[in-house]
Curated annotation (Swiss-Prot):
Post-translation changes: S-nitrosylation inhibits channel currents and ATP release.
Annotated transmembrane regions: 41-61, 107-127, 217-237, 278-298
Gene name linked to the record: Panx1
Record PTM Phosphotyrosine, positions in chain: 198
Name of the protein in question: Pannexin-1
Disulfide bond residue pairs: 66-264, 84-245
Key words of the record: Calcium, Calcium channel, Calcium transport, Cell membrane, Disulfide bond, Endoplasmic reticulum, Glycoprotein, Ion channel, Ion transport, Membrane, Phosphoprotein, S-nitrosylation, Transmembrane, Transmembrane helix, Transport
Keyword Transmembrane appears in the UniProt entry: yes
Functional description taken from the UniProt entry: Ion channel involved in a variety of physiological functions such as blood pressure regulation, apoptotic cell clearance and oogenesis. Forms anion-selective channels with relatively low conductance and an order of permeabilities: nitrate>iodide>chlroride>>aspartate=glutamate=gluconate. Can release ATP upon activation through phosphorylation or cleavage at C-terminus. May play a role as a Ca(2+)-leak channel to regulate ER Ca(2+) homeostasis.
Source organism, top-level taxon: Eukaryota
GO process annotations (BP): ATP transport; calcium ion transport; cell-cell signaling; monoatomic anion transmembrane transport; positive regulation of interleukin-1 alpha production; positive regulation of interleukin-1 beta production; positive regulation of macrophage cytokine production; response to ATP
Complex formation: Homoheptameric.
Amino acid sequence: MAIAHLATEYVFSDFLLKEPTEPKFKGLRLELAVDKMVTCIAVGLPLLLISLAFAQEISIGTQISCFSPSSFSWRQAAFVDSYCWAAVQQKSSLQSESGNLPLWLHKFFPYILLLFAILLYLPALFWRFSAAPHLCSDLKFIMEELDKVYNRAIKAAKSARDLDLRDGPGPPGVTENVGQSLWEISESHFKYPIVEQYLKTKKNSSHLIMKYISCRLVTFVVILLACIYLSYYFSLSSLSDEFLCSIKSGVLKNDSTIPDRFQCKLIAVGIFQLLSLINLIVYALLIPVVVYTFFIPFRQKTDILKVYEILPTFDVLHFKSEGYNDLSLYNLFLEENISELKSYKCLKVLENIKSNGQGIDPMLLLTNLGMIKMDIIDGKIPTSLQTKGEDQGSQRVEFKDLDLSSEAAANNGEKNSRQRLLNPSC
């Protein structure tokens, strides 16, 4: 019965979906903070203004008010308002006091803002689907390798310390140069760090930086066009809120009881003028920020990798490049995800101690630090592995006991056979 119950549990466990393992770098930022700020403001502000415009339309009702004769019923007056609102984009039915002004801009003002919001979101969408997956995999590889370089340094420093302790105390001249002996570590621990070689290849690559510059260029052009449109709309909004409308068409064309023209006024123009001014001011302030994003990769910052100069054979001088390339962009994203890089925190502590201390060898300090756990679940051993290890340990103990008993039985058998050979009476 117990065997059947156990077999049933195994069968049902095979059908259960396994929970996905938790990734090590689960909070990687694949967009720079300044770019994310520009996208949120440039896209979110028009959407907010559109919601305010539609809220005003819902609260007021109609967007136009036409002066109808007192002889008109309320249905006839509503027909005049609806007809003139629908004929706003038709120049033949309208006549403005200021000339032929594009009155349709007032009618489609919220939708034009929505169009700008969509256009400004396209660069972020393009970056997310074309560049972010490749960037994410590269950042995970680089950060894992940086942690591995740090772990190898600790392992090498501890092995050198154990070697010195095993050899025993030496003469005074040797003890004075203990720091130097720790630096002279076997090249097998640090020979050709793969992360250093991989980062050097990014100096000659420009695929990622071209995508980044293209996205920033599209954002700049769209914001500039939006500023031109908003300034133009703000300048003409106060001149074109009133116009004359004719409804004589079809069966009403020869009706003498209907006036030739109706005086109409767009009610929402004042609100739209205020919204366009707010949007224009914010976009004008965003233009210098967008221009600044063009020059961010040109800074060539290597502050994060400079900390790793404490480790042997890790040379940051080879990472400094000129002009725009992928390496400058990778340095920026490493700086953006510095909170996920555990080895950087430890090496930063060593750098501060080394700068404040007097003649302290960082390799000696490495022996006091712990290694970074590179497990997927960050050092947490699954319970299944623990129970499996315990079962294997118990099996080893049982096998060991069996081996000992078999060896004892064999020894007893050999002893008895020797006694029979020595004693002829047996």
